[in-house]
Amino acid sequence: MYKLDLVSDPRELAAIEARRNREKERQSRFFNVRNRVMGVDVEALNYQVEERKFREAIERNKDIAYGTKHAHYDLVAQMLEKEEAERAYRLSKRVQDFREQRQQQYKNGHEFDFWDPDQFQEFRVPYYEKDAYFGPASMQYFFGEDLERASHVRMQQEQMRYNLEKQLQEQQAAREEEARAALLSDQLRLAADTRAAELARLEESCRAAMRTAMANANKAQAAKQALQQRREQQRQQEANLTEVKKQVTSDLLTENPQVAQRANAPHRVLPYCWKGMSAEQRAAIRKTQETQRQEKKEQRQAEKLVEAEWGRQNKRLAEAALELEEQERELCAEFRRGLGSFNRELAKEQQAQQNYLNSVIYTNQPTAHYYLQFNTSSR
C-alpha cells in the first residue's frame, strides 16, 4: 500500500477546531483561581461595562442634540431681535419722514410757533422786486429784521385768542363735568342713604315683630309649664296621701306575725315582714351549731393524723433518695476508673498504629511529577 496524503473534510476540521477551542475556554474557566474562588462573572461585568458605555453615549448624543437645539434657538432669537430692531428703526424713520414732509404745511397755521426767533432765517426777504434775490452785501435785509411784523403780531394775537378760547372751553367743560360728577355722586349718596334708611326701618320692624312673636311664645310656654307644674304637684300630693294611708293600715306597722309566712312554702318567710324567731327556733339553731362544732373538731383531728402520716412517709422517701445518691456516686467513680484504663489502652494502640504508618507506610514522599498528572483536562 502507498501512503497517500488525503485531503481532510473541512467540516470535520472545523468541528475539531471548535471542540479544541471549547476545551481551552473550559480549562481557562476551571483553572482560573480568581473566577473559581471569588466567583467573578466576567461576561456579566463586560455586559455591564458595555451597557454603561452605551448609556453614556446616548447621554452624550442627547447633550449634543440639546446644545445644537439651544444654539439654533439662540440664533432664531437673535434674528427675531434683529428683525424687531429693524422694524422699530423703519417705523421711527417713517414717522420722522412723515413729520419732515407732511407736517411742514402747518407752519402758517395755528400750530406754528410764532415765538421761535430763528423761524425766518431760512427764507429770502425781497424788498424791491418780488422774485429777485439779493445777497447780504446788497443791504436789502438785515439779520433779525422782521418786515411783516404787523401781520405776525396779528397772527400771534389770533393764536392767543384761539388758545384762550380753547382753554376757557376746556375749563368750562371740566367744570361742567365736575358739576355733573358731583350731582351724580350726591344723587347716588342720597339714594344709598334712602336705601339704607329704608333697610334700617324694615330691619327694625322685623325685629319688633320677632320680639313680639317671641314674647307671645314665651308667655304661652310659661303658661303651659305652670299648668304642668300644678298638675304634677296635685298628682304628687294625691300619691303621698295614698302612700301614707297604705302604710298606716299595712301589716308592717300593725306587726302581724302571720304576714311573714308564705302560703306555698311554710318553711320560708318574707324578709320585709319577718319580726324575729321564736324560742324553739333559736334552740334548734343552737343545737345544730353545737353538732357542727363537734364535726369540725373531729375533722381537724383526722387531718392532723393524715399530716403526721405524710410527714413520716416523706422522711422515709428522703432517706431512700440519699441512699440512691450514694450508690450513684460509687457507680460513677467506678465507671470513670474503667473509662480511664480503656482510654489509656486505646491511646497505646493508636500510638503504635501511628508509629507503624510513619516508619513503614509514609516513607516515600511524592515528587513534582506526581502532582503534574492531575488537572490536565477539564473533564
From Swiss-Prot:
It is found in: Cytoplasm, Cytoskeleton, Flagellum axoneme. One of its GO terms (biological process) is flagellated sperm motility. The keyword Zinc-finger does not apply. InterPro entries: RIB43A. It comes from the Eukaryota. GO terms for cellular component: axonemal A tubule inner sheath; sperm flagellum. The keyword Cell cycle does not apply. Keywords: Cell projection, Cilium, Coiled coil, Cytoplasm, Cytoskeleton, Flagellum. Residues 154-252, 283-335 form a coiled coil. PANTHER family: RIB43A-LIKE WITH COILED-COILS PROTEIN 1, RIB43A-RELATED. Microtubule inner protein component of sperm flagellar doublet microtubules. Belongs to the RIB43A family. This is RIB43A-like with coiled-coils protein 1. The gene is Ribc1.
